[in-house]
């Protein structure tokens, strides 16, 4: 018979970080850099572990060039062709600052695998692979991870998405280094409404991080961050990386053209399982499928650098409030308190800084 779990599961909106005594005199003293050695690839990562999503409107080459200046990572979306990858590498002249902060995304079809192998063989500096499916619980996905690990034994593999500890363990033991955590929390994802499936993001991160770290693996919180405070909460919950999409949407570096409506500028932003994405890349929505994503006009925000400064400033502030001198200490210092109200929104909810 159906089973109900009565233990409360929490999202970012359900908690706040409790402030604690601190020896820090300034936010400038906070060190946001992390260094990880991955379980399966044995490679070392150094950077600020905030990751641009591999959505085609966010995970662009242009985004990667800017984010790399801040030591942030970009998972390049899977719809770039081999020639476009070649042109990008030539343009940046294999800049190690950029190449060390990007990964190639791939689906799990035969053609996806062939393109992945071609690009990785062509660009030896490319050391990160992101294997991305909506449902990371499928046996075919686990088999694909094993196949990619066998083909690329020294590449670092991100894989997901899942939301429970036992599946995190399965993916890590199958060859993944970093497991992406999150089903349905994204700002333009409608999976929870269409399928009724999901898991509150903070609880998913807490439980999956515990499972992963027990195997010397890593987790990436993917989705659900509506402001810099949510990013801090994800790190506080044990995430090693935090992937963001909506917070980076609408900028110059995003895919698509700027459009004008009623005198205001916008950029199109949509989920990768939306009607828009499926029609763009597959010609139509298959009869057996339903759209599981929204398409919205995102207010134009100008250059992404301004938003990155705001995001990193919020992270430093969170660390300062709870007495963490380094981002590494955030999860150790974090205590969450349950709340019924986050903020006083009498005038406006949080908005990412943008250029009107």
Curated annotation (Swiss-Prot):
User: What's the Enzyme Commission number for this chain?
Assistant: 1.7.1.7
Keyword annotations for this protein, in alphabetical order, are:
Metal-binding, NADP, Oxidoreductase, Potassium, Purine metabolism
Entry superkingdom: Eukaryota
Q: Which residues form the active site?
A: 189 (thioimidate intermediate), 191 (proton donor/acceptor)
Binding residues for NADP(+), per the UniProt record? 26-27, 78, 132-134, 183-184, 272, 288-289, 317-320
Q: Which PROSITE patterns match?
A: IMP_DH_GMP_RED (PS00487)
Residues that hold GMP according to the record: 222-224, 245-246, 271-273, 289-293
- SUPFAM superfamilies xref list: Inosine monophosphate dehydrogenase (IMPDH)
GO cellular component terms, A-Z: GMP reductase complex
- Its GO biological process terms? purine nucleobase metabolic process; purine nucleotide metabolic process
For this chain, one GO molecular function annotation is:
metal ion binding
Is Phosphoprotein given among the entry's keywords? no
Catalytic reaction equation(s): IMP + NH4(+) + NADP(+) = GMP + NADPH + 2 H(+)
* InterPro entries, per the entry: Aldolase_TIM, GMP_reductase, GMPR, IMP_DH/GMP_Rdtase_CS, IMP_DH_GMPRt
Residues binding K(+) are 184, 186, 189, 192
Family matches, as SMART domains = IMPDH
Which PANTHER family does the entry mention? Answer: GMP REDUCTASE (PTHR43170:SF5)
- Family statement drawn from the similarity comment of this UniProt entry: Belongs to the IMPDH/GMPR family.
Q: What does this protein do?
A: Catalyzes the irreversible NADPH-dependent deamination of GMP to IMP. It functions in the conversion of nucleobase, nucleoside and nucleotide derivatives of G to A nucleotides, and in maintaining the intracellular balance of A and G nucleotides.
Name-wise, this protein is: GMP reductase
The source organism is Ascaris suum
């Amino acid at each position: 018979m159906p089973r109900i779990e009565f233990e409360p599961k929490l999202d970012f909106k359900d908690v706040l970080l409790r402030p604690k005594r601190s020896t820090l005199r300034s936010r400038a003293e906070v060190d946001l850099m992390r260094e990880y050695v991955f379980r399966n690839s044995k490679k070392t990562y150094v950077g600020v572990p905030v990751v641009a999503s591999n959505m085609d409107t966010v995970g662009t080459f242009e985004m990667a060039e800017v984010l790399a200046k801040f030591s942030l990572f970009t998972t390049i979306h899977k719809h770039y062709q081999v020639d476009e990858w070649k042109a990008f590498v030539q343009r940046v002249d294999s800049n190690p600052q950029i190449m060390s902060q990007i990964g190639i995304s791939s689906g799990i079809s035969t053609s996806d695998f062939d393109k992945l192998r071609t690009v990785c063989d062509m660009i030896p500096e490319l050391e990160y692979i992101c294997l991305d499916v909506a449902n990371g619980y499928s046996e075919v996905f686990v088999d694909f991870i094993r196949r990619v690990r066998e083909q690329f034994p020294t590449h670092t593999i991100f894989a997901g998405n899942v939301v429970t500890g036992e599946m995190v363990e399965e993916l890590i033991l199958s060859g993944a280094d970093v497991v992406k955590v999150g089903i349905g929390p994204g700002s333009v994802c409608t999976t929870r409404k269409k399928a009724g499936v999901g898991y509150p993001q903070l609880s998913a991160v807490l439980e999956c991080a515990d499972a992963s770290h027990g195997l010397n693996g890593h987790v990436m919180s993917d989705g659900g961050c509506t402001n810099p405070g949510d990013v801090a909460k994800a790190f506080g919950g044990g995430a090693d990386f935090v992937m963001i999409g909506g917070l980076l949407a609408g900028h110059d570096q995003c895919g698509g053209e700027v459009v004008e409506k009623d005198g205001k500028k916008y950029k199109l932003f949509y989920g990768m399982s939306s009607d828009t994405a499926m029609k763009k890349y597959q010609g139509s929505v298959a009869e057996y499928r339903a759209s599981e994503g929204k398409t919205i006009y995102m207010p134009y925000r100008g250059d992404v650098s301004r938003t990155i400064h705001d995001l990193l400033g919020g992270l430093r502030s969170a660390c300062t409030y709870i007495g963490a001198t380094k981002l590494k200490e955030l999860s150790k210092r974090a205590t969450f308190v349950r709340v019924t109200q986050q903020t006083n929104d009498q005038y406006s909810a949080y908005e990412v800084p943008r250029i009107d």
